[in-house]
């Protein structure tokens, strides 16, 4: 990696109150001195101090600024760092950066500041990946999970598991090198118990990835129902604006409508679908087929029943789509005379052989009644109703999950080798495979190409 001094704009490229140009590297202070005019030289002021002055391009004043000076290694990157706080217009920030680059800095690559923090030991790879997750978080849970990982929750848990693995690996290797003084007789049972404990810990982390994905990507939510059941009205209420056209004409929604909403700290990626019914209209039929496809991939199905009309064969088709999904059934139009009851719905569910308890809620989309109960029910169905980031660790990253799965498979091989009575060096091989897989999460067992690929996904200036 280049150790030259880099610079980039660290704030968004939009007109705003303040813009920040960050400089990091061995010559950050000297380069800042070449463009900064104030009462004192940047190279002479104490670390972690802020100074008022101007950025100069020769004799021309570019902007009035506050400059933050930080000496390494007590910085984000571990290097000498200067952050120039200027006015936030896109042109003036670009001019400040241009002036800094003319003074000797190199334009930073995407994610290069965080990459340097990783390479300089300021954070491990799981924490580095959490940086981008903080930036891209779209709800409270995603943010808190990312902050927890940035503070070292994943790093510490992986470190704990790796220490157990390397302890047993070291014992076996030492015993094989010095059999006269160290015996491995009976050690297989000790190792098997330890391996089973590690597998349980890995399983817990792997299982957390489902919650992690939902926190990060949102709940894929599909609204199903017959035509004119009130699906589009429900979407409009949840979205807080008129996203869908609502009429008394059946089949108004022919294609899918997508909307992202925030619900009590969660993100719902909602898809409003065409009403499920038998139709000869080619376009509407395509919409119905699409609705069925989306239902298969959904994390959550909200089935809207028009409680003022009797159930029919179209409802039977919808019941077939929801039996293996997390589902909330809404008895809509509770403000009218209703003919469909919760008992009738539960009887239909029972006839389908569904054992799980499906929430059934009476609502009126027209009067906006029952919506709060729907929100509370959805939250309770996901993330155990609420989450604690004090002790729980959540995996939100597919790369990390794959590494955990690989480590678990290696530990299963250890147990297989023990049960099969294979030589102890077989145990050691699989233990080290698990150790290396977990090292991929923290970055201790990862190649330069993968490091470059990970950081290339970061935004400029971070």
Regions found by a protein language model. Name each.
Residues 2-9, 13, 37, 140-262, ...:
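C-terminal-of-GTPase-core extension/linker across diverse P-loop GTPases
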Residues 270, 304, 330:
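Generic enzyme active-site microenvironment
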Residues 51-63, 67-71, 251-279, 297-300:
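Switch I (G2) and immediately adjacent beta-strands of P-loop GTPase domains
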Residues 1-144, 148, 152, 328:
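A glycine-rich (often HGG/GG-containing) alpha/beta subdomain
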Residues 88, 238, 273, 305-308, ...:
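Glycine-rich, N-terminal phosphate-binding loop of Rossmann-like dinucleotide-binding domains
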Residues 284-308:
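Inter-motif core of Ras-like GTPase G domains
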Residues 16, 48-50, 297-301, 324-327, ...:
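Short glycine-/polar-rich loops that comprise or flank the Walker A/P-loop
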Residues 106, 267-269, 359:
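Conserved beta-strand segments of alpha/beta enzyme cores
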